[in-house]
């Protein structure tokens, strides 16, 4: 998917899905640059892999360069204790399996009370608000969308889903 800010293309966030029997493998690539008056104020490039078995997250790994800082997440499901074990650049420890990886493809993100940052592994409580159904135009085509706002202590994301 393309990422726009003020109707200007600023990057991409691509997802690739592979399924085999009860397993789903999701690969994610993101790159975006935000400029203000021709000065770069935010830049990110990331690669991540999620693995699910029977719709249950069993592992997640990512490497990210954000504003010239290297960040990472290595997460595995401890099936014996039904908890995630996270080693990340901002958090290392255990997490409840009620948490969702904060990637935009997963509609469960909109139903979760907290998310695991796909950049650093930190756990963020969130509040999701449905704003409205909206119609947007891209490249001469009209799309019906749903507009949500996701708030956390670190700010908010204004998210429009096709």
Model regions: which residues?
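Hydrophobic alpha-helical segments, especially N-terminal targeting/anchoring helices
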Residues: 3, 51, 136, 161-162
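N-terminal mature ectodomain segment of secretory-pathway/periplasmic proteins
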Residues: 3-79
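Solvent-exposed helix/loop surface patches that form functional interfaces
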Residues: 6, 61-154
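Short beta-strand or tight-loop elements
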Residues: 11, 126, 157
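Short, surface-exposed loop and linker segments with low hydrophobicity and enrichment for Pro/Ser/Thr
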Residues: 16-24, 104-105, 142, 160-162
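Gly/Pro-enriched, hydrophobic low-complexity segments
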Residues: 27-29, 43, 144-162
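Short histidine-centered beta-strand/loop micro-motifs
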Residues: 38-40, 139-140, 159
